[in-house]
Amino acid sequence: MDNFGGNFFNSYSNNSNREVEGNQYFDPYFVKHRKRTTKAQLKVLEETFETNIRPDANMRKKLGEQLGMTPRSVQVWFQNRRAKIKKLTQKKMMQQENTDNTKGPDAAHGSSSPKECKYNSYYPYIPIQGPLEEFNVYPRDNSIYKHGMPQGMASPIMYEGFGYRGHEEYGYPYVQRYGGGEYYQMQYPYGMVQAQWHQPPGFRDDDYYHSARKQQYRGGAPNSEKM
Protein backbone atom coordinates (compact mmCIF):
# COMPACT_ATOMS: atom_id res chain seq x y z
CA MET A 1 0.00 0.00 0.00
CA ASP A 2 2.81 2.42 0.92
CA ASN A 3 4.48 1.77 -2.38
CA PHE A 4 1.20 2.38 -4.27
CA GLY A 5 0.55 5.59 -2.35
CA GLY A 6 4.01 6.93 -3.11
CA ASN A 7 3.67 6.30 -6.83
CA PHE A 8 0.25 7.98 -6.95
CA PHE A 9 1.56 11.07 -5.14
CA ASN A 10 4.54 11.41 -7.46
CA SER A 11 2.31 11.06 -10.53
CA TYR A 12 -0.08 13.72 -9.25
CA SER A 13 2.79 16.11 -8.52
CA ASN A 14 4.23 15.70 -12.02
CA ASN A 15 0.85 16.34 -13.65
CA SER A 16 0.35 19.44 -11.53
CA ASN A 17 3.70 20.81 -12.64
CA ARG A 18 2.82 20.31 -16.31
CA GLU A 19 -0.60 21.89 -15.92
CA VAL A 20 0.66 25.16 -14.46
CA GLU A 21 3.24 25.63 -17.20
CA GLY A 22 2.66 28.73 -19.27
CA ASN A 23 0.54 30.33 -16.53
CA GLN A 24 -2.38 28.01 -17.46
CA TYR A 25 -4.34 26.29 -14.78
CA PHE A 26 -5.97 22.95 -15.57
CA ASP A 27 -9.53 22.64 -14.31
CA PRO A 28 -10.71 19.01 -14.37
CA TYR A 29 -14.34 20.20 -14.14
CA PHE A 30 -14.10 22.55 -17.07
CA VAL A 31 -16.72 21.88 -19.75
CA LYS A 32 -15.70 22.72 -23.28
CA HIS A 33 -18.57 24.25 -25.24
CA ARG A 34 -19.02 23.89 -28.95
CA LYS A 35 -18.11 26.94 -30.96
CA ARG A 36 -20.37 28.00 -33.78
CA THR A 37 -18.85 28.82 -37.12
CA THR A 38 -19.08 32.42 -38.20
CA LYS A 39 -20.59 33.54 -41.51
CA ALA A 40 -17.15 34.03 -43.02
CA GLN A 41 -16.01 30.57 -41.94
CA LEU A 42 -19.26 29.01 -43.15
CA LYS A 43 -18.91 30.62 -46.57
CA VAL A 44 -15.41 29.22 -47.09
CA LEU A 45 -16.42 25.78 -45.86
CA GLU A 46 -19.46 25.62 -48.14
CA GLU A 47 -17.44 26.73 -51.16
CA THR A 48 -14.91 24.01 -50.42
CA PHE A 49 -17.68 21.44 -49.94
CA GLU A 50 -19.03 22.15 -53.43
CA THR A 51 -15.73 21.11 -54.99
CA ASN A 52 -14.56 18.49 -52.50
CA ILE A 53 -16.86 16.77 -50.03
CA ARG A 54 -14.05 14.69 -48.48
CA PRO A 55 -10.94 16.85 -47.93
CA ASP A 56 -7.79 15.05 -46.89
CA ALA A 57 -5.65 15.83 -43.84
CA ASN A 58 -3.56 18.46 -45.63
CA MET A 59 -6.66 20.26 -46.88
CA ARG A 60 -8.25 20.19 -43.42
CA LYS A 61 -5.06 21.59 -41.90
CA LYS A 62 -4.92 24.45 -44.41
CA LEU A 63 -8.58 25.27 -43.85
CA GLY A 64 -8.06 25.22 -40.10
CA GLU A 65 -5.16 27.65 -40.35
CA GLN A 66 -7.10 29.88 -42.71
CA LEU A 67 -10.29 29.94 -40.63
CA GLY A 68 -8.79 29.75 -37.16
CA MET A 69 -10.20 26.28 -36.55
CA THR A 70 -8.62 23.01 -35.57
CA PRO A 71 -8.32 20.28 -38.23
CA ARG A 72 -10.63 18.14 -36.12
CA SER A 73 -13.30 20.84 -36.16
CA VAL A 74 -13.06 21.08 -39.93
CA GLN A 75 -13.37 17.31 -40.23
CA VAL A 76 -16.46 17.23 -38.01
CA TRP A 77 -18.09 20.00 -40.05
CA PHE A 78 -17.63 18.06 -43.30
CA GLN A 79 -18.95 14.87 -41.70
CA ASN A 80 -22.07 16.64 -40.50
CA ARG A 81 -22.65 18.26 -43.88
CA ARG A 82 -22.38 14.93 -45.72
CA ALA A 83 -24.83 13.33 -43.29
CA LYS A 84 -27.27 16.20 -43.81
CA ILE A 85 -27.16 15.89 -47.61
CA LYS A 86 -27.68 12.13 -47.39
CA LYS A 87 -30.68 12.54 -45.10
CA LEU A 88 -32.32 15.12 -47.36
CA THR A 89 -31.81 12.90 -50.40
CA GLN A 90 -33.41 9.89 -48.70
CA LYS A 91 -36.35 12.00 -47.56
CA LYS A 92 -36.94 13.29 -51.07
CA MET A 93 -36.86 9.75 -52.50
CA MET A 94 -39.40 8.55 -49.93
CA GLN A 95 -41.74 11.41 -50.76
CA GLN A 96 -41.47 10.58 -54.46
CA GLU A 97 -42.29 6.91 -53.79
CA ASN A 98 -45.32 7.86 -51.68
CA THR A 99 -46.56 10.14 -54.46
CA ASP A 100 -46.26 7.36 -57.03
CA ASN A 101 -48.09 4.92 -54.77
CA THR A 102 -51.02 7.29 -54.19
CA LYS A 103 -51.58 7.62 -57.95
CA GLY A 104 -52.43 3.93 -58.18
CA PRO A 105 -51.65 1.33 -60.84
CA ASP A 106 -54.09 2.86 -63.36
CA ALA A 107 -51.90 5.94 -63.79
CA ALA A 108 -49.13 3.94 -65.43
CA HIS A 109 -51.54 2.27 -67.88
CA GLY A 110 -53.41 5.46 -68.70
CA SER A 111 -50.43 7.06 -70.40
CA SER A 112 -49.90 4.13 -72.76
CA SER A 113 -51.58 4.41 -76.14
CA PRO A 114 -54.08 1.69 -77.14
CA LYS A 115 -52.88 -0.98 -79.52
CA GLU A 116 -53.80 -0.50 -83.12
CA CYS A 117 -56.68 -2.62 -84.27
CA LYS A 118 -55.84 -5.50 -86.57
CA TYR A 119 -58.67 -4.61 -88.92
CA ASN A 120 -58.54 -0.83 -88.70
CA SER A 121 -58.42 -0.67 -92.51
CA TYR A 122 -61.84 -2.31 -92.70
CA TYR A 123 -63.74 -0.23 -90.19
CA PRO A 124 -62.99 2.88 -88.13
CA TYR A 125 -61.54 2.51 -84.66
CA ILE A 126 -64.08 3.38 -81.96
CA PRO A 127 -62.65 4.24 -78.53
CA ILE A 128 -64.37 2.60 -75.60
CA GLN A 129 -64.02 5.79 -73.53
CA GLY A 130 -66.30 7.69 -75.91
CA PRO A 131 -69.95 8.42 -75.09
CA LEU A 132 -72.59 5.86 -76.00
CA GLU A 133 -74.18 8.19 -78.56
CA GLU A 134 -71.16 7.88 -80.82
CA PHE A 135 -71.92 4.23 -81.49
CA ASN A 136 -75.42 4.99 -82.78
CA VAL A 137 -74.34 7.64 -85.28
CA TYR A 138 -73.14 5.84 -88.39
CA PRO A 139 -72.47 6.43 -91.21
CA ARG A 140 -70.91 9.80 -90.40
CA ASP A 141 -70.86 12.81 -92.67
CA ASN A 142 -67.39 12.02 -93.95
CA SER A 143 -68.11 8.31 -94.40
CA ILE A 144 -68.24 6.66 -97.81
CA TYR A 145 -71.17 4.50 -96.73
CA LYS A 146 -74.15 6.72 -97.53
CA HIS A 147 -76.72 3.95 -97.98
CA GLY A 148 -79.53 3.30 -95.60
CA MET A 149 -79.68 0.42 -93.15
CA PRO A 150 -82.35 -2.30 -93.48
CA GLN A 151 -84.59 -2.99 -90.53
CA GLY A 152 -85.19 -6.39 -88.98
CA MET A 153 -82.13 -8.09 -90.45
CA ALA A 154 -80.89 -11.08 -88.54
CA SER A 155 -77.62 -10.76 -86.67
CA PRO A 156 -75.31 -13.69 -87.49
CA ILE A 157 -71.83 -14.22 -86.08
CA MET A 158 -69.86 -10.98 -85.70
CA TYR A 159 -66.92 -10.51 -88.04
CA GLU A 160 -64.61 -7.76 -89.18
CA GLY A 161 -64.45 -6.29 -92.67
CA PHE A 162 -66.69 -6.96 -95.62
CA GLY A 163 -66.65 -8.65 -99.01
CA TYR A 164 -68.54 -11.23 -101.04
CA ARG A 165 -69.03 -14.93 -100.56
CA GLY A 166 -65.83 -16.70 -101.44
CA HIS A 167 -63.62 -13.76 -100.47
CA GLU A 168 -62.68 -15.22 -97.09
CA GLU A 169 -59.41 -16.41 -98.57
CA TYR A 170 -58.52 -12.78 -99.42
CA GLY A 171 -59.45 -11.49 -95.96
CA TYR A 172 -62.92 -10.14 -96.85
CA PRO A 173 -65.77 -12.09 -95.17
CA TYR A 174 -68.93 -12.18 -97.22
CA VAL A 175 -71.86 -9.81 -96.84
CA GLN A 176 -75.54 -10.63 -96.64
CA ARG A 177 -77.93 -9.80 -99.42
CA TYR A 178 -81.09 -7.92 -98.55
CA GLY A 179 -83.40 -7.08 -101.40
CA GLY A 180 -81.34 -5.45 -104.11
CA GLY A 181 -78.50 -4.43 -101.79
CA GLU A 182 -75.68 -6.11 -99.97
CA TYR A 183 -74.76 -5.25 -96.42
CA TYR A 184 -71.93 -5.94 -94.00
CA GLN A 185 -72.12 -5.96 -90.24
CA MET A 186 -70.49 -3.15 -88.26
CA GLN A 187 -68.19 -4.24 -85.44
CA TYR A 188 -68.82 -2.67 -82.03
CA PRO A 189 -67.28 -3.31 -78.61
CA TYR A 190 -68.97 -6.22 -76.91
CA GLY A 191 -71.96 -5.27 -74.78
CA MET A 192 -72.22 -1.64 -75.96
CA VAL A 193 -74.98 -1.66 -78.60
CA GLN A 194 -76.69 -4.11 -80.89
CA ALA A 195 -75.11 -5.03 -84.19
CA GLN A 196 -75.99 -2.81 -87.14
CA TRP A 197 -75.68 -3.47 -90.83
CA HIS A 198 -74.32 -1.05 -93.43
CA GLN A 199 -74.18 -1.19 -97.19
CA PRO A 200 -70.67 -1.01 -98.65
CA PRO A 201 -69.87 0.67 -101.96
CA GLY A 202 -70.42 -1.48 -104.99
CA PHE A 203 -67.42 -3.45 -106.17
CA ARG A 204 -66.81 -6.79 -107.81
CA ASP A 205 -63.92 -9.17 -108.21
CA ASP A 206 -62.61 -7.32 -111.25
CA ASP A 207 -62.21 -4.15 -109.18
CA TYR A 208 -59.48 -5.82 -107.16
CA TYR A 209 -58.55 -8.97 -109.09
CA HIS A 210 -58.96 -9.68 -112.78
CA SER A 211 -60.33 -13.07 -111.84
CA ALA A 212 -60.72 -14.90 -108.55
CA ARG A 213 -59.36 -17.99 -110.29
CA LYS A 214 -56.42 -16.22 -111.93
CA GLN A 215 -54.98 -15.17 -108.61
CA GLN A 216 -55.98 -17.43 -105.75
CA TYR A 217 -54.07 -15.43 -103.15
CA ARG A 218 -52.71 -11.95 -103.10
CA GLY A 219 -49.25 -12.08 -104.59
CA GLY A 220 -49.76 -15.64 -105.84
CA ALA A 221 -48.89 -17.04 -109.25
CA PRO A 222 -51.43 -16.27 -112.01
CA ASN A 223 -53.74 -19.00 -113.28
CA SER A 224 -55.16 -19.11 -116.80
CA GLU A 225 -58.42 -20.66 -115.60
CA LYS A 226 -61.45 -18.36 -115.71
CA MET A 227 -64.40 -18.18 -113.41
UniProtKB/Swiss-Prot annotation:
Subcellular location field: Nucleus
One GO CC term, this protein: nucleus
PROSITE patterns, sorted: HOMEOBOX_2 (PS50071)
InterPro entries: HD (IPR001356), Homeobox_DNA-bind_prot (IPR051000), Homeodomain-like_sf (IPR009057)
Biased composition range(s): Polar residues: 92-102
DNA-binding region: 30-89
Gene Ontology terms for molecular function: RNA polymerase II cis-regulatory region sequence-specific DNA binding
Protein name: Homeobox protein HD-10
